[in-house]
């Protein structure tokens, strides 16, 4: 559960029954990885779904434009939409992501600082800032990622305490064009006073990754199916992402 809970809930009155009267986190974000591709630009397409047990499926299609400004700084503007069987898909948030790489191979791991500014599109909704360290290392042909993020609300969301979440990923370079692995995400509640375990959200599952040459650039894709808890309830998630680098 995170500050983003309130952002989503203000726009999901039709799904109030799902929320059981409490705030719940937006559970779908993608594993932040360390970038080191100076000058590369990206068109970013994302799509993910959440299917809580006994409730209708919620979908989040997203589209973004990214730019590796140099060997240390990646920035992206992202529009996130939301939809369900009970209402039409609409613009939900505008997001600005910035990742700054602090190390470049001089240590056994690479460290980046990640920030994400989240601006909801419904009235009187405030905004939120996600920030924290992103770690990446390689063990043989396996890439490992682990990230810890804090999220703080401002404006009408300022009453929400700063929340703590985590991400992890294992990615084995099986062939040149296909990698296999796993991903996991979780939200534990306020950073300095974790929720009871039964009220936390944790989910994990298998993931596939691939890349396809496309003229002067590359099309990269990934997909994952995660099981566990979303909204502190049992529910499954499917995520898919396609990046066109040029």
Model-derived regions, located:
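Cleavable N-terminal export/targeting peptides
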Residues: 1-29
